């Protein structure tokens, strides 16, 4: 059971509500389109009406007035477990970390990842760079969330994770105040994952970190890292069975696999929900000397404005891809990051992989440009999904990133963000 939030919160009622429920979103997951506008079919994801959901969790979303000019969508979400949970979270690497990030990190450390009961999220106000008052507001949100389920006084303080997203530099008004900025190192992205599997608290942090490295830390929309990024996992063990306590156990490996695959699915949905996005693009770097180098190249291409605008314009400008590949390994002018050359131009190949299963369109082979069929290239770029393959021909490692294009709508959304 998951709730993801970008610039605005997307809420799905999966079990039963703990607060008022907004009927307009029943069964539908809303993506980045203004509430008053028609939502494109590609931006709608339907939640199944049947299935197996984790036991012992309550989830709800409601409107509380954080966004006074937009009363048509919820601005507060609440996920609670009926019993105390093991929990873990990964947070933004931005130096200006928001009050909810600081409060939640300290709470998890104080409780040693055990005894957590809920996650409370608001949209409309990031509560970032708000000083001492903002910290007090985040702590009040924790206290109010705890009060909803009569949390016992165990001397360890609050037991709720708090998340906020919205405008930076604005204070929250108690509990009721408070998908751009997406780039690795937990970048604005908020996510909650709930499981009823019995996982020892000490194991959850590494399980989540491993999953996030291959998912949320492998996506980029605009290259900006938010002050508020947080992904949390709660495990209440209600499903029963023997608790997973060993990293070498088969159950640990099985849970890691499922958690990672699930996180990848969620991360891809975040990219598809990119502000103004019209394309979902996979950047795959293969035959690299090192995984670190491959990730660096994929990341650089994924956040290149020239590559992203070319994709929006349906322009098979492979020179921009090659340019981003070439400068990806530069940390200081003229200095390679690694001693082993990651990129040998004479061995590098670039292709478009169509989403319809048709043969790849080779753009560059071993450093030599191909005679590109521009008509076929345009046909490939008409599709929403596209893979860009960069084969370095110099090793066995690979890396994958997911990104989207830059459109006119992206500029409009972010140009009018506060107005």
Swiss-Prot record:
How this protein is processed and modified after translation, per its record? The alpha and beta chains are autoproteolytically processed from a single precursor protein within the mitochondrion.
Q: Name one GO biological process term.
A: ornithine biosynthetic process
Site (described: Involved in the stabilization of negative charge on the oxyanion by the formation of the oxyanion hole): 165-166
Record keywords, A-Z:
Acyltransferase, Amino-acid biosynthesis, Arginine biosynthesis, Autocatalytic cleavage, Mitochondrion, Multifunctional enzyme, Transferase
Q: At what residues does the UniProt record annotate the site feature described as Cleavage?
A: 187-188
Q: What is its main location?
A: mitochondrion
Its UniProt entry gives the catalysed reaction(s) as: N(2)-acetyl-L-ornithine + L-glutamate = N-acetyl-L-glutamate + L-ornithine; L-glutamate + acetyl-CoA = N-acetyl-L-glutamate + CoA + H(+)
What InterPro entries is this protein classified in? Arg_biosynth_ArgJ (IPR002813), ArgJ-like_dom_sf (IPR016117), ArgJ_beta_C (IPR042195)
Q: What does this protein do?
A: Catalyzes two activities which are involved in the cyclic version of arginine biosynthesis: the synthesis of acetylglutamate from glutamate and acetyl-CoA, and of ornithine by transacetylation between acetylornithine and glutamate.
Q: What is the name listed in the Swiss-Prot or TrEMBL entry for this protein?
A: Arginine biosynthesis bifunctional protein ArgJ 1, mitochondrial
Q: Which organism is it from?
A: Sclerotinia sclerotiorum (strain ATCC 18683 / 1980 / Ss-1)
């Amino acid at each position: 059971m998951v709730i993801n939030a970008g610039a605005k919160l997307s809420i799905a009622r999966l079990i039963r509500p703990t607060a008022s429920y907004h009927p307009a979103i029943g069964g539908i997951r809303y993506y980045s389109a203004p509430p008053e506008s028609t939502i494109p079919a590609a931006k709608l994801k339907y939640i199944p009406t049947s299935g197996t959901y984790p036991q012992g969790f309550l989830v709800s979303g409601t409107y509380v007035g954080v966004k006074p000019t937009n009363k048509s969508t919820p601005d507060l979400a609440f996920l609670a477990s009926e019993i105390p949970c093991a929990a873990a979270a990964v947070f933004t690497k931005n130096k200006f970390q928001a009050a909810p990030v600081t409060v939640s990190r300290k709470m998890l450390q104080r409780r040693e990842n055990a005894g957590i009961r809920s996650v409370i999220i608001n949209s409309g106000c990031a509560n970032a760079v708000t000083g001492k008052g903002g910290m007090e507001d985040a702590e009040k949100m924790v206290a109010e969330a705890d009060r909803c389920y009569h949390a016992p006084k165990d001397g360890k303080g609050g037991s709720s994770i708090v998340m906020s997203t919205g405008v930076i530099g604005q204070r929250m008004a108690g509990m009721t105040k408070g998908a751009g900025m997406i780039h690795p190192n937990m970048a604005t992205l908020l996510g909650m994952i709930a499981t009823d599997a019995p996982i020892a608290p000490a194991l959850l942090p590494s399980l989540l970190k491993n999953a996030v490295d291959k998912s949320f830390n492998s996506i980029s929309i605009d290259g900006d890292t938010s002050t508020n990024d947080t992904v949390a996992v709660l495990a209440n063990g209600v499903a029963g069975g023997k608790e997973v306590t060993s990293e070498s156990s088969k159950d640990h490996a099985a849970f890691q696999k499922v958690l990672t695959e699930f996180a990848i699915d969620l991360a891809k949905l975040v990219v598809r929900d990119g502000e103004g996005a019209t394309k979902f693009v996979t950047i795959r770097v293969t035959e690299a000397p090192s995984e670190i180098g491959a990730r660096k190249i994929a990341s650089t291409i994924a956040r290149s404005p020239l590559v992203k605008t070319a994709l929006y314009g349906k322009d098979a400008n492979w020179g921009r891809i090659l340019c981003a590949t070439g400068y990806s390994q530069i940390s200081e002018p003229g200095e390679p990051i690694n001693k082993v050359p990651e990129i040998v131009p004479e061995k590098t190949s670039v292709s478009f992989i169509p989403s319809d299963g048709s043969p790849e369109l080779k753009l560059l082979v071993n450093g030599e440009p191909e005679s590109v069929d521009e008509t076929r290239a345009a046909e490939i770029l008409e599709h929403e999904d596209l893979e860009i393959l960069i084969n370095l021909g110099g090793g066995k490692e690979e890396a994958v990133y997911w990104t989207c294009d830059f459109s006119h709508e992206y500029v409009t959304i972010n140009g009018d963000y506060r107005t």
